[in-house]
Amino acid sequence: MKRLCIPIVETTMGKALIAIKEVNRLADLIELRADYLRGAKLALLLENRQKPFIVTNRSKEEGGKYKGEERKRLSFLQEAIDLGADYIDVELATERSSLQGLIRNKRGTQVILSFHDFRRTPSPKELQRLFGQMIRLGADVIKIVPFAKSWEDNLNILSLIPFAKARRQKIVAFCMGEKGKISRIFSPSLGAAWTYASLNQSRASAPGQLTVRELTDIWKTMR
């Protein structure tokens, strides 16, 4: 089953609420990129969701827009848990005790533990080592997204999906970049929990991200 997550990357509450209304029609999941949004009123945003909702507050070091104090960045994720968000996305690079605190206090929220590498794709052995580390930390969903410098990098990242399935672990895994587009398309067919697509080209939240229309058109031709 192919599942599609669409990120909300608006900068104002008004635009974010309009985008959520549109994304409710098109997506299986919604990701709020809170690092883009000024003055986020999280309770109001969650009230308007009709699909499972991921709250992400991505650090600048991992390709996000957040530039404030780390303490405030993480307290926003804790607020998302307290308000009943379906998922939070928190980086593996987060200071360990803070990360463990979020996982310990997650209540009914599932924790997506994420790793991004904007320079390269690790070897299959390195990817499996990362996977094991994230399992031990208590991730509900593992998300590993490196950068494809070659077509072969797609094979490396996609090989992690059956590896995770054999261990009954939910995973999101694909490559960023122009050469990584193919892994975005095929990862759900191999068993990834979902893949990401933007509402349009100007709203892409990562390099190589396809639009909803591009991705769904490709999937239709694959039937």
Residue ranges and their predicted role:
Residues 15-25, 73-83, 129-138:
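Alpha/beta enzyme core
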Residues 162-223:
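C-terminal alpha-helical cap/extension of soluble enzyme domains
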Residues 69-74, 124-130, 156-159:
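Charged helix-capping and loop-helix junction motifs
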Residues 36-50, 92-108, 122-125, 149-164, ...:
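Active-site-adjacent beta->alpha loops and helix N-cap segments on the catalytic face
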Residues 53-101:
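Glycine/small-residue-rich loop that forms an oxyanion/phosphate-binding "nest" at active or ligand-binding sites
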Residues 7-9, 29-38, 77, 85-96, ...:
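Catalytic beta/alpha-barrel core
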Residues 26-28, 50-52, 82-87, 104-113, ...:
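Glycine-enriched alpha-helix->loop->beta-strand junction motifs that scaffold or abut catalytic
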Residues 1-63, 69-74:
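Conserved N-terminal beta1-alpha1 strand-loop-helix module at the mouth
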